[in-house]
């Protein structure tokens, strides 16, 4: 639904569970264009939090989204989730003041999003922090992204929407990116 504000209070956690034999994440939706890129970039519904075609969405903190049960691998098994947040063809999205830990393949996969603000978000993960794909009017500011085994902030243009679309009008400012051990930035131990 559009016009949603998800507020994660101080000390609150949204925890991604491990799938079981009978329960799991939404299945990856069919996408005839998967041959143009890897599995993680071609599906949105197999995520802890996902939205398609939404407007006026805010997720804010200061709580934590903990992708404990998400995989960082290219799993195509039913019920396995591989992203913390996925947004496709959304407008007017604000993500601010919360933290993401162990996010699977991506902390955020934003594809075809117009008017996206990511402010003061902390990501401590083992793969990509923010993947900004086919988006326009994006502002990323005052964020911390620790991604020791992959990309911290990725800007790209792909066929994720089934057609090529540029990423345009992006501003990134006052961010800190690092490659410390997974989890050690949020717990302030800064280990390698």
Which residue ranges define each predicted feature?
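Extracellular/periplasmic carbohydrate-active domains that bind, remodel
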Residues: 1-192
